[in-house]
Amino acid sequence: MNVEQVYKDANALLEGHFLLASGNHSSRYLQSAKVLEYPQKASLLTDALAEMIRENGIEVDTVCAPALGGVIAGYELARSLGVRSIFVEKKESGMELRRGFEVSPGEKIIICEDIITTGGSALKAAEAIEALGAKVVAFASLANRGFCKRVGGSNEAKSECKLPKDVPFFALEDFTFEMYTPEECPMCKEGSTAIKPGSKG
């Protein structure tokens, strides 16, 4: 499957001048919400991700996603794997289970996101789950922004990657875009103004 083409077909791979959450700028942006608005495309992607996880012998009881961005991807991956789906939500520091969700000691959990950049949110989700006695057996995402090394990927982990090195990370594709500080951004130097994509438009 050509994952990049699936994103392009769904208008989920944007080109322009973007202000990222990190404060850096980029000429490309992944908007996974656009690819996930089509249940058939979401199923296609998570079925492929589930197959990778199975092929690597990962046993899992539950998929847990950080809200909000990971919820649909996590739910669909759980469906593809035939297990239950839960999510954690932000609190003042870190994340927590709410809404009556529970995990058991030793329960095998995969943390799933739509996109993993440095893995910061996924790591906070893992810490919340492991504090309750469950075991995180893998991290997964549809797309990897290239800071973390995925199973089968050619990219090496960069210093910004927050995922633990001893837990496998599965993703369908590496999307490595150039990022610039505002001071070094060539688009800014040409007079362009960065726009903030994501939840507000």
Swiss-Prot record:
GO terms for molecular function: magnesium ion binding; orotate phosphoribosyltransferase activity. It comes from the Bacteria. It is an enzyme of class 2 (transferase). PROSITE patterns: PUR_PYR_PR_TRANSFER (PS00103). Keywords: Glycosyltransferase, Magnesium, Pyrimidine biosynthesis, Transferase. 5-phospho-alpha-D-ribose 1-diphosphate binds at residues 90, 113-121. Orotate binds at residues 117, 145. Its EC number is 2.4.2.10. It catalyses: orotidine 5'-phosphate + diphosphate = orotate + 5-phospho-alpha-D-ribose 1-diphosphate. One of its GO terms (biological process) is pyrimidine nucleobase biosynthetic process. Transmembrane segments: none annotated. Pathway: Pyrimidine metabolism; UMP biosynthesis via de novo pathway; UMP from orotate: step 1/2. Belongs to the purine/pyrimidine phosphoribosyltransferase family. PyrE subfamily. Homodimer. Catalyzes the transfer of a ribosyl phosphate group from 5-phosphoribose 1-diphosphate to orotate, leading to the formation of orotidine monophosphate (OMP). This is Orotate phosphoribosyltransferase. It comes from Sulfurovum sp. (strain NBC37-1). The gene is pyrE.
